[in-house]
């Protein structure tokens, strides 16, 4: 992790609009009517409804998705008691995390009050505004009483994240580390160094999970907390040990199975780690300097199972894995509280997630090939997109089962879809593709079975149930790669096209291809040679019905692949060209871009084919095409160069297909801005319509356009390139394609294959 300088931190917070969060309107406000509805007089109606039924605040206001992050600044991170206002950047940061990880809106509230009673009164007074309250950076022991009282006296979820966030994540880590070590929680000896809010809450949750009080030793700055001491508060007395033979950490740690550190750096020595039981679990969570460094712990004994609070080492105990999703589940059930059942549900959901196959987006983020459950990975990574569904659902179910939910979630699949859409992890179009493919999975050939991304994509597509994968490549090489990536090849067919066992099939394919291209100078001998190439062999599998779709491109230049596709598969009747399309899923909507791959310098005839194919393809995806044919000029303003080709294509399409919403040539800003276009060019056939399909004048502009959009907003989902115009489902990837890109194209290929089969059956 790069070193953060003071100058960089201050610049980050001050540049542009100061701070890190803002309020954004969620309703229209551009007209006087909008404003009259938003405020007076229209706003009176929801006010009266809420007066009659306070629960309607969840229906008519933002309360149900609004959390207060409240602090008095008495224990700010590692800075201590710096005051309420000084802690505001931290509270804004917490609000940012709520928003980006769970879509929850936040008001940060800094209360300049250290007296617990007055602080409680202030929070209670503003509580009606919020659906939940996250207490933050309040010092112990006052934080215990403040949280207890607010939980008792308010009917919305209240959680002090410094206590329970760390407790939940470390508990999930402990559950999994114990599984790796082959130990049971009720049997292990636990040493806790630190007795602040986090340490106390962690240890209490361990007890809820089955740890025995008599097996726990807790230490504070004065040493072991024993029943012989007279200086203990209520929280410390709960964990006081009967043992009188130990007084220091060095004495307490001997033979221990688990060390939990929430204290200060460098207090646990290598000798202490060596004195622990076999496969010791060390959670050194002091930040930024752990109780023992990862390097020192691992060099002391290689069997240690270690977690820290740092992102640059394995198994980070990071509260962001928990609090956004715990509040998400609580808010979505309008829960009255966050109780022990909900916290334990979160623990098990987080723990179970670490045991599941890791999405490629996570591997990519951490620059590894394949994370898998074990000593270096027993806690999920914060970027794991499954946390929003796994943890939120578990918490919501626990809220309902434990009786604190005011509303029920009845369709859990729909709820998960809602959560993924909320975070932009899934668009409606993508979900429809996958759902359709699952209902009728087809045989899909993956050309480059030895490429890690294609192998992962085939395995993921199989797991998603969208296809029956066939991998082309050497069995042993693919098996070895799968073993390295910890992937199961169960249910996946491997075809070694160069193996002698495939000689009969190569000969059969050669005869068919030679006969098909006989009048084009293509001999049987040439065809036989080509069958040792993956693209020829794979496409012939589709051509002969041995497979239903083919995906290629990670190792092959497009120009070569296009040539093979034309020779083996051919172009659909009625067309002289084929092309490709990219689909862009953005917050503004779904857009279709063509031709993004095939035709470098299309003439008018080619542009006509691209437009006709785009029309068919957009309808294939259940959208009504509104097509803009792009150029650098508008509607005949330039009568030379490329605009003339586009203008000619538009004239043809409007004449031959008068029902089609298509116009041009036009600049992209006029295509994308309906009001601007209608005002300047009221005669256009697209008047009053929002364009969703963009036809580019050449490959340079198309390629630059979609890649510019990708670079400017990496969160925008692109699906493609989607082939348009070949006789059968041959689809392309490129060397930049991620696993998710390939799986998305696989879903498209499957649906393409289904449509082709239906057409053939109807003939």
Task: Please state what every model-predicted region is.
Residues 237-305, 310-312:
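Rossmann-like adenosine-cofactor binding region
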Residues 2-3, 161-162, 181-183, 284-392, ...:
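Adenosine-phosphate binding glycine-rich loop
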Residues 127, 185, 252-253, 273-276, ...:
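A short, aliphatic-rich alpha-helical micro-motif
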Residues 193, 209-236:
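NAD(P)-binding Rossmann-fold cofactor-contacting core
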């Amino acid at each position: 992790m790069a070193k953060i300088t003071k100058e960089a931190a201050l610049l980050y917070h001050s540049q542009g609009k100061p701070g890190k969060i803002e309020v954004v309107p969620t309703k229209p406000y551009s007209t006087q009517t909008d404003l009259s509805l938003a405020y007076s007089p229209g706003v009176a109606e929801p006010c009266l409804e809420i007066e009659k039924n306070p629960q309607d605040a969840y229906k008519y206001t933002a309360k149900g998705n609004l959390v207060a992050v409240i602090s008095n600044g008495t224990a700010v991170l590692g800075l201590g008691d710096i005051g309420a206002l000084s802690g505001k950047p931290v509270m804004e940061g917490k609000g940012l995390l709520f928003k980006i990880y769970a879509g929850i809106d936040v008001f940060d509230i800094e209360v300049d009050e250290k007296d617990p009673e007055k602080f409680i009164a202030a929070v209670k007074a503003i509580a009606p505004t919020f659906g939940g309250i996250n207490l933050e950076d309040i010092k112990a022991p006052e934080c215990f009483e403040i949280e207890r009282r607010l939980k008792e006296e308010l009917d919305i979820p209240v959680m002090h994240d410094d206590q329970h966030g760390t407790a939940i994540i470390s508990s999930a880590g402990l559950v999994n580390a114990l599984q790796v070590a082959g130990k049971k929680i009720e049997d292990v000896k636990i040493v806790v160094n630190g007795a602040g809010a986090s340490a106390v809450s962690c240890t209490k949750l361990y007890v809820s999970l089955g740890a025995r009080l008599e097996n726990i030793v807790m230490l504070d700055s004065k040493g072991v907390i024993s029943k012989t001491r007279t200086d203990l508060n209520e929280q410390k007395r709960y964990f006081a040990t009967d043992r009188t033979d130990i007084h220091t950490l060095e004495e307490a740690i001997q033979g221990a199975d688990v060390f939990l550190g929430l204290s200060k750096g460098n207090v646990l020595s290598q000798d202490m780690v060596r004195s622990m039981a076999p496969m010791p679990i060390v959670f050194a969570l002091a930040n930024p300097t752990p109780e023992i460094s990862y390097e020192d712990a691992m060099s002391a004994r290689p069997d240690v199972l270690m977690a820290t609070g740092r992102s640059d080492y394995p198994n980070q105990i990071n509260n962001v894995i928990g609090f956004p999703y715990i509040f998400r589940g609580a808010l979505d059930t309008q829960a009255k509280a966050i109780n022990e059942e909900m916290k334990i549900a979160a623990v098990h959901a987080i723990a179970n997630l670490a045991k599941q196959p890791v999405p490629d987006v996570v591997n990519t983020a951490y620059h590894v090939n394949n994370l898998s459950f074990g000593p270096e990975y027993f806690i999920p990574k914060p970027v794991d997109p499954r946390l929003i569904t796994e943890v939120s659902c578990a918490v919501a179910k626990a809220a309902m089962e434990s009786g604190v939910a005011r509303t029920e979630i009845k369709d859990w699949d729909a709820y998960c879809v809602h959560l993924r859409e909320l975070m932009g992890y899934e668009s409606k179009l993508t979900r429809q593709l996958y759902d359709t493919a699952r209902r009728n999975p087809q045989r899909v050939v993956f050309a480059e079975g030895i490429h890690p991304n294609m192998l992962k994509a085939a395995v993921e597509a199989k797991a998603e149930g969208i296809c029956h994968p066939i991998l082309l490549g050497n069995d042993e090489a693919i098996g070895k790669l799968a073993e390295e990536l910890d992937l199961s090849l169960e249910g996946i067919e491997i075809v070694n096209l160069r193996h002698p066992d495939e000689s009969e099939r190569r000969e059969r394919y050669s005869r068919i291809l030679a006969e098909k291209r006989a009048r084009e100078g293509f001999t049987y001998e040439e065809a036989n040679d080509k069958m040792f190439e993956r693209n020829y062999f794979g496409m012939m599998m589709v051509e002969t019905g041995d497979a239903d779709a083919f995906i290629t491109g990670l190792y092959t230049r497009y120009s070569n692949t296009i040539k093979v596709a034309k020779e083996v598969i051919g172009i659909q009747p009625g067309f002289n060209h084929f092309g490709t399309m990219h689909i862009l899923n953005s917050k503004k909507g779904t857009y279709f871009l063509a031709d993004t791959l095939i035709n470098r310098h299309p003439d008018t005839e080619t542009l006509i084919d691209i437009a006709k194919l785009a029309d068919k393809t957009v309808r294939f995806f259940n959208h009504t095409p509104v097509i803009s044919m792009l150029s650098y000029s508008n509607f005949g303003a330039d009568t030379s160069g490329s605009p003339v080709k586009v203008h000619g294509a538009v004239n043809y399409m409007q004449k031959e297909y008068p029902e089609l919403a298509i116009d041009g040539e036009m600049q992209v800003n006029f295509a994308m801005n309906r009001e601007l276009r209608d005002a300047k060019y009221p005669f256009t056939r697209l008047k009053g319509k929002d364009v969703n399909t963009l036809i580019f004048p050449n490959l340079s502009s198309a390629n630059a356009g979609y890649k510019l959009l990708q670079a400017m907003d990496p969160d925008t989902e692109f699906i493609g390139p989607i082939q348009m115009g070949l006789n059968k489902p041959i689809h392309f990837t490129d060397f930049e394609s991620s696993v998710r890109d390939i799986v998305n194209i696989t879903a498209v290929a499957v649906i393409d294959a289904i449509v082709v089969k239906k057409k053939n059956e109807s003939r």
